[in-house]
Amino acid sequence: EQQGLPAPKILISERAQVLMPYHVALDCYEEERLGKNSFGSTKSGIAPFYGDKFQKIGLQLCQLYYPDVLREKLAHALDIKNAMIVNLYHREPVDLEALIVKLTELAERIRPYVADTDAYMMQAVREGKKILLEGQLGTLRDPDHGIYPMVTSSSPLAGYGPVGAGVPVWSIKEVIAVTKAYSSCVGAGPFTTELFGDEAEELRKRGGDRGEYGATTGRPRRVGWFDCVATRYGCEMQGATEVAMTNLDVLGYLDEIPVCVAYELNGERVDHFPVTPKLEQCKPIYVKLPGWKCDTRGIKNFDELPENARHYIEFLEKEVGCPFKLISNGPRRDEIIYR
């Protein structure tokens, strides 16, 4: 506002759970305690946050505006949290009064944006407005259907989108799954097609917008070849109606491109995505496709892509079993090929 910019047109649900400073601290302390057995957390407080939510000791945003409720809820939570912080992690306890002051100040700053978003969204549904829900992470980080326990704490499946947004399930008509032209991951867990050494570093350096590095942590992402087994499973669990594939342009340096079409488990071919203990024993079965050895950036029509690039997309599409409708051919928003 001081710079003359308009206020953001956003609404924050009054029912939203509040991420506390001690959630972040506990996340960091636990990763440090686990050492080499850590889960590869982003140390953003996600697991402690959801733990409090489901133990019903978390705070909803609306409760920050009722001083007595805030104090009572926070005092109860800190009885538990400080016991952990002091006795398990051997750190200084959180000060109740200082935290109340901080939360009260923050609550006033965002007060203009706090609203009954459930009512707002339902009105949008009744008026037939277009609604776009966006999720992060993917199927393999889902706590039920992913590579448990190396997962996140809330479901990244499209089916949970309406739950989080407060709209009827039937109001969602299309589900667009997003995948890269290769595989990448931040965090621990089995990664069947993972690359190492110089081969991995070359792909990592060329990938993403400015290389494959975590948006939150900045740490190097693990990278590998496209995994049709995992992607097919992901699309099935998401109920995807179409796929948007990014980073096609990244692969233009390769003479040939391995694609994982199945796994080998104890000497047998596996075409479905297995549970984590079995996945850890799987080896990739590759088909090698010819590369196109040129820069495809600037191409806007699918038919103008090199023949081998088109064949690569069509091969993945057939293996995954879902139409690839959008192809990202560069980091800019306008570098998308629509099919």
Residue ranges and their predicted role:
Residues E1-R339:
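Non-transmembrane, aqueous-exposed alpha-helical and coiled segments at domain scale
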